[in-house]
Amino acid sequence: MTDIFTTSKRSFVMLKIHSKETKPEVLVRKFLFFQGFRYRKNDKRYVGKPDIVLSKYKTVVFIHGCFWYGHSCNKGHIPKSNTDFWLEKITKNCERDIKNETELEKIGFKVIVVWECELKNKAICRERLNRLVREIKDAV
């Protein structure tokens, strides 16, 4: 399928996509706050600027978009156009995250990843968020 935008228009559109304050991030943060957790968001003091840092529990949470991290769900596929570029980009994202997670674990943090697709369906979302709370509490 061809792109409906020109190359310059596509670049402009892609520049407007931000990596913070996504719907999945806001959903997870609101849930955690409602559950009584206090946290910092996108804390630059830690490698990889985790989406959520729960210092009291020595836990960081990353909320990953399935497309950007090549998740095995149906949203994690490589686009048919410019395949080499996207394959390289997504591979680098994954490699960088493995390195960052290793560094965070070395300094004593538990790393939890929540996938975007786990938050789409209400029943699955509820289960995932409840499991997240258990994972955080088990980290202590």
Swiss-Prot record:
Signal peptide: none annotated. Its EC number is 3.1.-.-. Keywords: DNA damage, DNA repair, Endonuclease, Hydrolase, Nuclease. One of its GO terms (biological process) is mismatch repair. The keyword DNA repair applies. The keyword Hydrolase applies. One of its GO terms (molecular function) is endonuclease activity. CDD domains: Vsr (cd00221). Belongs to the Vsr family. May nick NmeAIP sequences that contain T/G mispairs resulting from m5C-deamination. If unrepaired, these mismatches can lead to C-to-T transition mutations. The very short patch (VSP) repair process counteracts the mutagenic process by repairing the mismatches in favor of the G-containing strand. This enzyme is an endonuclease that nicks double-stranded DNA within the sequence CCGG (C-methylation site unknown) next to the thymidine residue that is mismatched to 2'-deoxyguanosine. The incision is mismatch-dependent and strand-specific. This is Type II nicking enzyme V.NmeAIP.
